[in-house]
């Protein structure tokens, strides 16, 4: 696995570069990406936004927001006791895909969560995308216990029609 530098993204330039990677990696238009102002607000309110760098070039990113473990029918539980991260999106420039950067970003996200005392990270992925399945289950050891049909609704870009 090739080593790249991974560090938090904190500047408006970082957020704009993240948007460009989002569009390139997922084949999206600007309207279908997370705006830089939203990334800035999320990053300053408990979200974890990390970037992978090859030298000075941002080549990939991962975003996770704070959430709570679902406890249907139990609104009396204190949220702090149910904290988790929800890994929202990861994007890697096509020229750098397949080099283990996704694994490195996910592991860095895990380390950041553990430093905060958060012991659970959840995310969604399409089980028919074999590369994602290999990463999530094969490499990261994720446990799948739920399937949501059409979780994100109609999608654009690379995921259109899935």
Task: Give the label of every model feature segment.
Residues 4-94, 126, 148:
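A conserved beta-strand-loop-helix scaffold within acyl/acetyltransferase catalytic domains
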Residues 96, 100-108:
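Conserved acetyl-CoA pyrophosphate-binding loop and the N-cap/start of the following alpha-helix
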Residues 126-127, 133:
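Conserved acidic functional residues
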Residues 113-126:
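Conserved GNAT acetyl-CoA-binding A-motif
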Residues 69, 124, 138-158:
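Conserved catalytic-core motifs of GNAT/GCN5-like acyltransferases
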């Amino acid at each position: 696995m090739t080593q790249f530098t991974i560090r938090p993204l904190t500047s408006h330039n970082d957020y704009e570069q993240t948007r460009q990677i989002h569009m390139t990696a997922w084949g999206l238009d600007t309207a279908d990406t997370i705006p830089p102002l939203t990334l800035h607000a999320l990053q300053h309110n408990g979200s974890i936004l990390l970037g992978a760098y090859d030298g000075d070039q941002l080549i990939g990113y991962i975003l996770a927001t704070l959430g709570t473990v679902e406890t249907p029918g139990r609104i009396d539980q204190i949220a702090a006791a149910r904290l988790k991260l929800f890994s929202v999106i990861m994007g890697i420039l096509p020229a750098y895909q397949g080099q283990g950067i996704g694994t490195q970003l996910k592991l860095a996200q895990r380390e950041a969560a553990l430093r905060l005392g958060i012991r659970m990270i959840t995310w969604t992925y399409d089980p028919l995308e074999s590369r994602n399945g290999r990463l999530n289950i094969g490499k990261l050891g994720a446990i799948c216990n739920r399937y949501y049909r059409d979780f994100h609704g109609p999608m654009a870009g690379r995921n259109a029609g899935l």
